[in-house]
Amino acid sequence: MADLEAVLADVSYLMAMEKSKATPAARASKKILLPEPSIRSVMQKYLEDRGEVTFEKIFSQKLGYLLFRDFCLNHLEEAKPLVEFYEEIKKYEKLETEEERVVRSREIFDSYIMKELLACSHPFSKNATEHVQGHLVKKQVPPDLFQPYIEEICQNLRGDVFQKFIESDKFTRFCQWKNVELNIHLTMNDFSVHRIIGRGGFGEVYGCRKADTGKMYAMKCLDKKRIKMKQGETLALNERIMLSLVSTGDCPFIVCMSYAFHTPDKLSFILDLMNGGDLHYHLSQHGVFSEADMRFYAAEIILGLEHMHNRFVVYRDLKPANILLDEHGHVRISDLGLACDFSKKRPHASVGTHGYMAPEVLQKGVAYDSSADWFSLGCMLFKLLRGHSPFRQHKTKDKHEIDRMTLTMAVELPDSFSPELRSLLEGLLQRDVNRRLGCLGRGAQEVKESPFFRSLDWQMVFLQKYPPPLIPPRGEVNAADAFDIGSFDEEDTKGIKLLDSDQELYRNFPLTISERWQQEVAETVFDTINAETDRLEARKKAKNKQLGHEEDYALGKDCIVHGYMSKMGNPFLTQWQRRYFYLFPNRLEWRGEGEAPQSLLTMEEIQSVEETQIKERKCLLLKIRGGKQFVLQCDSDPELVQWKKELRDAYREAQQLVQRVPKMKNKPRSPVVELSKVPLIQRGSANGL
């Protein structure tokens, strides 16, 4: 029966993988729902307050770029040639060979530069033209040939074009997507969890599928009780910090994190899924690798280390077991549990795996940085070639002996090694950090310039264009059976109790890596959801034309911010009522859909604006004169934050104005402000229209 269950688990997992690759959106069992377009009013202010509504910020985001591109290509004729030119340059930069670049560079020059020059309508500088012409005359076609044009295209787009985008419906759609992104609260219900694929000291790793996009990931679940039992809280939190540091920017050579979340019992990391097994496994199955095969793995690992070191992260656990293969045979560095940030303080702890640890790591009290990883790389490459670490002779398992040899032994390299390989390994395995390759001031560049890698084009390595020496078999789960992986003995943690203080440690654990979420959405459901939302909004717009649209009421007025909230203000009502709210400098108005805005609170009536919690949900509490209370609930975290800020600012400014105005004697004050009255104070409009 156990065998049958294992087979069924494998089949289910493999089917999910295949369907995810073909049509991930079709595998989505949940649907992302975009908020109403009126969310723009609140979200624009929220993003502006954080410096996010700039050309650079929006253009550099995947979804921001796609919406800006759509606007320019389909709604702004003057910007269309600029964006088309930009896209052609980006395609050129990804070409694999010089021959392809020679042909394409000439086509781009003729279509987008010479044609415009002849028509006297070339909107770019003479320097940019001369830069490209000079290279083409010499038949030099580097990937960054058109970089001066990229800079000038962006300069031309960031002015009036960007301002028109901000005023368009495409920016409204950007606000809708950003609201979804900034309100992500993941739970186990957001994933379909498949078979176990690995186990570590604190928990297990599973294959899983994200419900709203259909994308496959690895879910690393750490048991909070086991963490507490082993006093591993610092290690668990450190791994989340290290993953967050290395998971931004384009690096296909590290197992990166897209999300982190926790439940009452578990910490969960959502990571890149690697289906091809690890190098330790393949070394045992395949036998030692040739120099050429090892060069392939070394090159990709070097780029992974370079990415980490550029972010001041030292990995500290480089070994074949931590190098995972994807289904095509390319590799990524995994498991950042021992990684460390050395940007502010260099570490001096002796951590890692014996036989791969650098001498400075083994020496007590000696501080080190990325130097440790280059020594470990030398040890690992030696193992790929010879089947054992250079300091683990005769398969000794004595850790003290291995450490002693690491600190004292001069490594003898076999005569069969090529001179270039000997030079590389001798440089990496230098005990003296000041003489070690990679530690002489230029980091990874020194290693990449080794004669051993002379035949490589590093751009081709980065683009993963070299054929892997080993391709994992398709249609197989390259992991041990669930039975062989085993499970934890729950008796171990039976007496461990998780206290409130334990849970407090993980209060800031949840995280979404913005660029990875946006990439996931763009690859899967972005177009589908945009099309569906467009249809829904068109129908609603037609209906609202008859009723009077909520946003129309704010037009031409001094409305600070407006949008939907739910209120609970009547002592006889226990249910939330969804209403559309308008904040003015001297009052807060609201109405139901299609109703006239008759209800309002003046700033004079409000005594304070506070945050409260009702059934574990954050709400806004407005304390009203006469001991009354008015509770507001927002649909998302950004809305709550922004409404609280705007209400407090309006209340404070109204109070200050009242204090500046001499009190009127013998004249009663009305608590209700007529809608026709002149506003108390003018603040910037954010009608979002």
From Swiss-Prot:
One of its GO terms (molecular function) is Edg-2 lysophosphatidic acid receptor binding. It catalyses: [beta-adrenergic receptor] + ATP = [beta-adrenergic receptor]-phosphate + ADP + H(+). Residues 454-521 form the AGC-kinase C-terminal domain. It is an enzyme of class 2 (transferase). Belongs to the protein kinase superfamily. AGC Ser/Thr protein kinase family. GPRK subfamily. GO terms for cellular component: cilium; cytoplasmic side of mitochondrial outer membrane; cytosol; membrane; plasma membrane; postsynapse; presynapse. It comes from the Eukaryota. Residues 1-190 are annotated as: N-terminal. Its EC number is 2.7.11.15. This is Beta-adrenergic receptor kinase 1. It is found in: Cytoplasm; Cell membrane; Postsynapse; Presynapse. ATP binds at residues 197-205, 220. PROSITE patterns: AGC_KINASE_CTER, PH_DOMAIN, PROTEIN_KINASE_ATP, PROTEIN_KINASE_DOM, PROTEIN_KINASE_ST, RGS. The record marks 3-4, 10 as: Required for receptor phosphorylation. It comes from Mus musculus (Mouse). Residues 558-652 form the PH domain. The active site is at residue 317. Residues 54-175 form the RGS domain. It holds the Pfam family RGS. InterPro entries: AGC-kinase_C, GPCR_kinase, Kinase-like_dom_sf, PH-like_dom_sf, PH_domain, Prot_kinase_dom, Protein_kinase_ATP_BS, RGS. The modification Phosphoserine is found at residue 670. Residues 191-453 form the Protein kinase domain. CDD domains: PH_GRK2_subgroup, RGS_GRK2_GRK3, STKc_GRK2. The lineage of its organism: Eukaryota, Metazoa, Chordata, Craniata, Vertebrata. Keywords: ATP-binding, Cell membrane, Cell projection, Cytoplasm, Kinase, Membrane, Nucleotide-binding, Phosphoprotein, Serine/threonine-protein kinase, Synapse, Transferase.
